[in-house]
Curated annotation (Swiss-Prot):
UniProt protein name: Protein EFR3 homolog B
Organism name: Danio rerio (Zebrafish)
Subunit structure: Component of a phosphatidylinositol 4-kinase (PI4K) complex.
InterPro entries given in the database record: ARM-like, ARM-type_fold, EFR3-like_ARM, EFR3_Homologs
Keywords, ordered alphabetically: Cell membrane, Lipoprotein, Membrane, Palmitate
Ranges that cross the membrane: none
Biological process according to GO: phosphatidylinositol phosphate biosynthetic process; protein localization to plasma membrane
Localization (cell): Cell membrane
Region (Disordered): 206-230
Gene3D superfamilies: Leucine-rich Repeat Variant
Membrane topology (UniProt): Lipid-anchor
Length: 816
C-alpha cells in the first residue's frame, strides 16, 4: 500500500511533499525559497516530524550522490542548514542524527567539493549551543576524517589548500562541540589528541615556508584569511585555551612525539614556536605542568644526540622566560636538579666519547655539540632563576653549591670514567651555572642571602690553583655584591682623575651590611690578598679583583671597612715589593697597578684632600719615571713592562705612615691604619689546597689541641687598661708569626717524623685524656654524706663510713 501511495503525489505524507517541493526542476535555479519557508514553518509547528524530515532528506541526498547529481546535493545541504538554524534547541536532537549521517556521506565522497561542503555544514552545526545533552552521539569518525583531510596530498595546490583548511575548520568544530560537554566522548583522550594535535602541527609547519617568502602587503591582506598556518594557529590556541589542569599532559605529549618523529628538535625554531603558542595559550597557573613535561622528556632523551637535547633545553629556556614568576611549580629544586644532572651527563659523554660506558663507540659524539648543549643548559638555569623570588634564588644558589665537588668539604661526585678532569669540568660548569643564577641578584640583607654554608665553600675556590675556577669565583662574588649596577663602571682598571663622571650610585651602609662585614670581612680581605699573589693570575683576574675592592667600598663600607681596605691595598704593594715571593715581573707590575688604581678610587671616595693629594703625587711620579706600575701600561694587549724590576723606594711608593697621618686628622683610626695588614691562614686554606695526608693529620691535631680540657681552664680576670690594648695591637704581628711557625713545625713533624714517634705522641695524649676522665668520675660519683662522719686512712685520705641506723646517736629531743 505504501508503494502505491508513493506513486501518487496527493497521497504522499505532507512532510515528503514539502521536502520534494524545495527542489527545482533545474538544479542551477537553486533552492525554491518560498517552498523552503513552508517546510521550515511546518518543522517548527510539528517538531515531532523533524526526524522524519531529516531521514527523508538524507535518503534523497544519498541517492543524488550516487547518481552524481551534485546540484541537488548542494540544495539538500542548504535546506538542512536552514532547518538546523531554525530549529529550537530542545528539538534539535531529533534532527541531528540524520544531519550527521548526511555530513558523513559527503566526507566519504571522493570529490573535494563535496568534502568541503560537508565540512562547512558541520562547522555551522558546531557553532549551535545545545541545551539538551546527547548520550549516544559519537564524533570519532569526524576526528579521523578531518585529521586525514589536514594531511591531504591532492595534486592541485589550490584544491589541496582548501581541503586542508576544511580539515582544520572541521577539527575546530569538533573541539568546540565536545570540549565542554562532559556527556560526550572525552576529546582529551590520547586516542583523539594523537590525531588532532599532529594534524595541526603538520599544517603549522607547512606554513613556515610560505610565510618566509614575504609577500607584498596587498597579497598578504588578500590571503591572510586563507592561510592554513594562520587558521591552524588560531585553532591550536583555542584548543589549548580550553584545556583544564588535568588535560594539559594529553595535549602536550603529542607535541613532543611529533617533534621527535620528525626530528624537529635540532632546528629549534619550530619547536620554540610551538611551545610559545602553548605557553601563551594555556592558563598561567598551568605553566609548570608544561615545564615538568619538558624536563621528563629531556630525561627520556638522555642518550639522544647532543643536538636533540640542546633543542629541548633551548625550548625550556624560552618557556622559562614566559612562565610567570613563581609558577615553576612546587618542586623548584627538582627543576635545577634535572638540569644539573644533564650537565653532568654531558661532561661524561664529552670525556668518555660514549653514551654508554659498556658500548664504547656505539655513537659518534661531537665535542663541540656537547659544549653547545652545556652552554644551553647553563643559560636555561639562569633563565629559570630569573623567574624566582629572592629567597628561592638563595636556595637555588645553596643547592648548586652543594653539588660542586670541593676537596675536603664536598666529596667528589662519582664519575663514569672521566677521572679528575671530569671533576674539574663539573666544577667549572656548576660555577658557570652559579654565575648565571647570581646575575641580577639583589638582596637587602646580605647576611641571610649569603650564609656560611654558601660563602665558605665559595671562598675556598678562590684559593685553588686553577685560574679559570678562580676567575669564575671572583665574577660570582662581584655579581652578588653589586646591588646598584655599578659593576660596568669598574670593568676596566684605570686611573680616574675625577670619579664624579662615573655617576656612581651610593647608599648608606645598612645595619645588616655592617653585620655581614663584621662577620666575613677578614675572609674577603684574605682571599683578595691570596688571589693576587697567585702566579697564574692574568689581566681578567686583576680586573675582577679591582671590581671586587671597588664594589665593597661602594656597597658595604663603613669607616672601619675603609681603613681595612686601605691596609689591604698597601699590603698588596708590599707583596709586589717582597723578595720572598717568587712572582713574575708581570704579576708584580699588575699588583702595583691594581693597588694604585684602587687607592686612587678610595682616596676620592673618602674625600680627604690630603689623602687625595698624596695618592695623586705618587701617581704623577710613576707616570714620569716608572709608568709600567700603572694600569694604562700593564692592562693592555701588549703590556709595556721591563724584563726585570729594579728595587723601588721613595716617592714612587704609597707611604703607610703618610696615609695614616693624613687620615688620622680626619678622625680615622690611626692605630689600625699604622698596623700592616697580614692575612690570617686558617684551616680553609688547607682544605682548598690540601695535597698530602700530613696536612690532614696536622689539621686534626690542631683541632684536638684547641678543644683539650687544658685550654678550657678558667684564668683569673685580668685588668684591661689602655696600655694593655695598645701592647696587644703592637704584639699581634709577632703572635701571628709565632702561630705560623708553630703550624709549620706541626706539618713538618707529621711529614718527616717516624711512625713510632707519632704513635707515642698520640698514646701520651690518650693517657692524659684517661687520667682527666678518672678525675672527673671521682668527683662526680661520690656517696652521699653520712651522719656518722668520716674516717681517716693511713695515707691521710678521708673515706666515708656507712653506719647502721641502730648505731647512730641522735639528740635526746629526737628520740620518742
Amino acid at each position: 500500500m505504501t508503494g502505491v501511495c508513493g506513486c501518487c503525489g496527493a497521497l504522499r505524507p505532507r512532510y515528503k511533499r514539502l521536502v520534494d517541493n524545495i527542489f527545482p526542476e533545474d538544479p542551477e535555479d537553486g533552492l525554491v525559497k518560498a517552498n523552503m519557508e513552508k517546510l521550515t514553518f511546518y518543522a517548527l509547528s510539528a517538531p515531532e516530524k523533524l526526524d522524519r524530515i531529516g531521514a527523508y532528506l538524507s535518503e534523497r541526498l544519498s541517492r543524488d550522490v550516487a547518481r552524481h547529481r551534485y546540484g541537488y546535493v548542494c540544495i539538500a545541504m542548504e535546506a538542512l542548514d536552514q532547518l538546523l538554524m531554525a530549529c529550537h534547541c530542545q528539538s534539535i536532537n531529533l534532527f541531528v542524527e540524520s544531519f550527521l549521517k548526511m555530513v558523513r556521506k559527503l566526507l566519504e565522497a571522493d570529490k573535494p567539493n563535496l568534502q568541503i561542503l560537508g565540512t562547512n555544514s558541520f562547522v555551522k552545526f558546531a557553532n549551535i549551543e545545545e541545551d539538551t545533552p546527547s548520550y549516544h552521539r559519537s564524533y570519532d569518525f569526524f576526528v579521523s576524517r578531518f585529521s586525514e583531510m589536514c594531511h591531504s596530498g591532492y595534486e592541485d595546490p589550490d584544491i589541496r589548500t582548501k581541503i586542508r583548511m576544511a580539515g582544520i575548520k572541521g577539527l575546530q568544530g569538533v573541539v568546540r562541540k565536545t570540549v565542554n560537554d562532559e556527556l560526550q566522548a572525552n576529546i582529551w583522550d590520547p586516542q583523539h589528541m594523537d590525531k588532532i594535535v599532529p594534524s595541526l602541527l603538520f599544517n603549522l609547519q607547512s606554513g613556515e615556508g610560505t610565510e618566509s617568502r614575504s609577500p607584498s602587503p596587498l597579497q598578504a591582506s588578500e590571503k591572510e584569511k586563507e592561510s592554513p598556518a594562520e587558521l591552524t594557529e588560531r585553532c591550536f590556541r583555542e584548543l589549548l585555551g580550553r584545556a583544564a589542569y588535568g588535560n594539559i599532559k594529553n595535549a602536550v605529549t603529542p607535541v613532543l612525539m611529533h617533534l621527535d618523529n620528525h626530528s624537529l628538535w635540532e632546528g629549534k625554531t619550530f619547536a620554540v614556536r610551538c611551545f610559545k603558542i602553548i605557553m601563551y595559550s594555556i592558563q598561567s597557573q598551568h605553566s609548570h605542568l608544561v615545564i615538568q613535561q619538558l624536563l621528563g622528556h629531556l630525561d627520556a632523551n638522555s642518550k639522544s644526540s647532543a643536538t636533540v637535547r640542546a633543542g629541548i633545553v633551548e625550548v625550556l629556556l624560552e618557556v622559562a622566560a614566559i612562565a610567570a614568576s613563581g609558577s615553576v611549580g612546587p618542586t623548584v629544586l627538582e627543576v635545577f636538579n634535572t638540569l644539573l644532572r644533564h650537565l653532568r651527563l654531558s661532561v661524561d659523554y664529552e670525556l668518555t666519547g660514549s653514551y654508554d660506558c659498556t658500548n664504547i663507540g656505539t655513537k659518534i659524539i661531537k665535542e663541540h655539540e656537547e659544549r653547545q648543549l652545556q652552554e644551553a643548559v647553563i643559560r636555561t638555569i639562569g633563565s629559570f632563576a630569573n623567574t624566582l623570588p629572592t629567597y628561592q634564588r638563595s636556595e637555588v644558589m645553596l643547592f648548586i653549591m652543594g653539588k660542586v665537588p670541593i676537596p675536603g668539604l664536598h666529596p667528589t661526585l662519582p664519575s663514569i670514567g672521566s677521572g679528575p678532569e671530569g671533576n674539574r669540568m663539573i666544577q667549572v660548569m656548576l660555577l658557570k651555572s652559579l654565575r648565571q643564577v647570581t646575575c641580577g641578584f639583589q638582596t637587602t640583607n646580605m647576611l641571610t642571602a649569603l650564609p656560611n654554608s654558601f660563602l665558605d665553600p665559595m671562598l675556598s675556590f678562590a684559593l685553588l690553583e686553577d685560574a679559570e675556577i678562580r676567575l669564575l669565583v671572583l665574577e660570582i662574588l662581584v655579581s652578588l655584591i653589586d646591588r646598584h649596577d655599578n659593576l660596568p663602571k669598574f670593568s676596566n682598571i684605570s686611573i680616574i682623575s675625577d670619579i664624579s663622571v662615573l655617576k656612581l650610585k651610593v647608599d648608606k651602609c645598612s645595619r645588616q651590611d655592617n653585620l655581614f662585614m663584621k662577620k666575613h670581612a677578614q675572609h674577603l680581605y684574605r682571599h683578595i690578598y691570596l688571589c693576587s699573589k697567585e702566579q697564574s693570575s692574568v689581566q681578567p683576574h686583576f680586573e675582577k679583583l679591582y671590581s671586587l675592592l671597588a664594589l665593597i667600598s661602594m656597597e658595604l663600607a663603613n669607616e672601619e671597612v675603609v681603613v681595612d681596605l686601605i691596609r689591604v691595598a698597601l699590603a698588596l704593594q708590599d707583596l709586589a715589593l717582597s723578595s720572598e715571593e717568587m712572582l713574575p715581573v708581570y704579576n708584580r707590575c699588575a699588583i702595583h697597578a691594581l693597588s694604585s688604581a684602587y687607592l686612587n678610587l678610595i682616596s676620592q671616595l673618602t674625600t680627604v684632600p690630603a689623602f687625595c693629594q698624596h695618592v695623586h703625587e705618587v701617581i704623577e711620579m710613576r707616570q714620569k719615571e716608572i709608568p709600567y706600575l700603572l694600569p694604562e701600561d700593564v692592562f693592555i694587549e701588549n703590556p709595556k713592562i721591563p724584563k726585570t724590576l729594579e728595587k723601588l723606594e721613595g716617592d714612587v711608593l704609597f707611604q703607610q705612615a703618610k696615609i695614616t697621618e693624613v687620615l688620622g686628622g680626619s678622625g680615622y683610626n690611626t692605630e689600625r691604619l699604622a698596623t700592616p695588614y697580614v692575612p690570617q691562614f686558617t684551616d680553609e686554606d688547607r682544605l682548598s689546597k690540601r695535597k698530602s695526608i700530613g696536612e690532614t693529620i696536622s689539621l686534626q691535631v690542631e683541632v684536638d689541641s684547641r678543644n683539650s680540657p687544658e685550654k678550657e681552664e678558667r684564668t683569673p680576670a685580668e685588668e684591661i687598661t689602655f696600655e694593655t690594648l695598645k701592647n696587644a695591637i703592637v704584639d699581634s704581628v709577632g703572635v701571628e708569626e709565632q702561630e705560623k711557625e708553630r703550624r709549620r713545625q706541626v706539618v713538618e713533624k707529621f711529614q718527616k717524623a717516624p711512625f713510632e714517634e707519632i704513635a707515642a705522641h698520640c698514646g701520651a695524649r690518650a693517657t692524659m685524656l684517661q687520667s682527666k676522665l678518672n678525675q672527673i668520675f671521682e668527683i662526680t660519683i661520690r656517696p652521699p654524706p653520712s651522719p656518722s662522719g668520716t674516717i681517716t686512712s693511713s695515707y691521710g685520705q678521708t673515706q666515708s663510713r656507712s653506719v647502721p641506723v641502730y648505731e647512730m646517736k641522735f639528740p635526746d629531743l629526737c628520740v620518742y
